[in-house]
Amino acid sequence: MKCELNPRLSSGDWKEFCSRFHFPLEELPNIQAIYKALLPLMESYAYYSLNQDLKEVSFSHYAYGFVTLGNGMDELSELYLNHEQIQEAYIVDCISLMLLSKAYEEFAYVVEEQSGLYLTELSFLGDTYSLDLLPQIYEQLAPDTIQFTEGQMLRPLKTATLILHLDTETHADVKQLCNTCENCKNFSCP
């Protein structure tokens, strides 16, 4: 299945953005201008399956898929780098990380709505589950806007592979269900 996503940063996200990525608040007008410039370039989609067809996943209810922001983020970042505008490229990458987190959240709600189940844990491929699953997931989902390279990488770069554990009973808020806190390098979660 394919679903278009529409992740956006709200006015309340900007202070957290500056704190998380160590930007002074005075930089916000420049950061927000870059954000407005990249929005039309974003083509965010989730490609996913509600089928229980991954033998490596032992849960009785789960979904799996890719979430991507599209090529526009990579292209804008590369454009800035080609013009030696390193800070602007970094800002694009930081905004992309925040938008990708929003896209995960939106994807989780789509899965909950379609499955009639509730998210209990969100896992990134490579954390709980082996990256060896990537070719199998890619083949089963056949995402038309994502490439799987010979080097076992996904393009666009702002693409993640997720496995969502589901249950019949409601649990914590989706923002509290990421399972990588022990190894996480983020200073604060979005």
What spans do the regions from the language model cover?
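General structural feature for long, well-ordered alpha-helical segments within catalytic domains
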Residues: N30, I34-L38, A103, F107, ...
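Active-site helix-to-loop segments that bind/position phosphate- or nucleotide-bearing substrates
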Residues: M1-E84, E88
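Generic secondary-structure signature for well-ordered alpha-helical cores
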Residues: E43, E112, G116, N186-C189
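Generic local-structure boundary detector
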Residues: S49, D53, D74-Y80, K102-E106, ...
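Weak global preference for isoleucine
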Residues: I31-I34, I86, I91, I95, ...
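Short terminal or interdomain "cap/linker" segment that borders an active site or interface and mediates
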Residues: Y118-S188
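Conserved mixed alpha/beta catalytic, RNA-binding, or beta-rich assembly cores of soluble enzyme
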Residues: F59-D127
